[in-house]
Amino acid sequence: MKNTDPVANTKIYLATSFFNEEQRARIPQALAQLEANPTVGVVHQPFDFQYKDARVDSDPAGVFGSLEWQIATYNNDLNAVGTSDVCVALYDMDQIDEGICMEIGMFVALHKPIVLLPFTKKDKSAYEANLMLARGVTTWLEPNDFSPLKDFNFNHPMAQPFPPFKVF
């Protein structure tokens, strides 16, 4: 018997850049789709769990950027990656972020699926994806389209390993 009934028990790690307004605006759009998905139980969004509530725009404890904050942030993210089932990466192809690359690499090393939603202002035919990213991602979605996150089966994440870009 095939078990294909959706169960809301998958923990998603939502990896995203947070450096400009455009990147930050993607988060609620992704969350809306993921929260409507019947196979998603929990979405871990790292910016909701900042060490001592330290953020770029608000730092009540005065620790943002310090070694203490760096170590805590790294370890908190590492723990969240370890306890998550699937990574959903909102990947800005036009403004590469080493942090999200590191998170993707951790999921690859742990043999956990990565669903990558690329964002680019370029035409697909004008972009080239790095082979390390291209081959590490389990499932590539079409650029700039949040809608597949609502219906994707995170209980049984099937591979779609071909990026919508040329690979170099």
Swiss-Prot record:
Its EC number is 2.4.2.6. This is Nucleoside deoxyribosyltransferase. Belongs to the nucleoside deoxyribosyltransferase family. Keywords: Nucleotide metabolism, Transferase. One of its GO terms (biological process) is nucleotide salvage. Pathway: Nucleotide metabolism; nucleotide salvage pathway. SUPFAM superfamilies: N-(deoxy)ribosyltransferase-like. It is an enzyme of class 2 (transferase). It catalyses: 2-deoxy-D-ribosyl-base(1) + base(2) = 2-deoxy-D-ribosyl-base(2) + base(1). The active site is at E103. One of its GO terms (molecular function) is nucleoside deoxyribosyltransferase activity. It comes from the Bacteria. Catalyzes the cleavage of the glycosidic bond of 2'-deoxyribonucleosides and the transfer of the deoxyribosyl moiety to an acceptor purine or pyrimidine base.
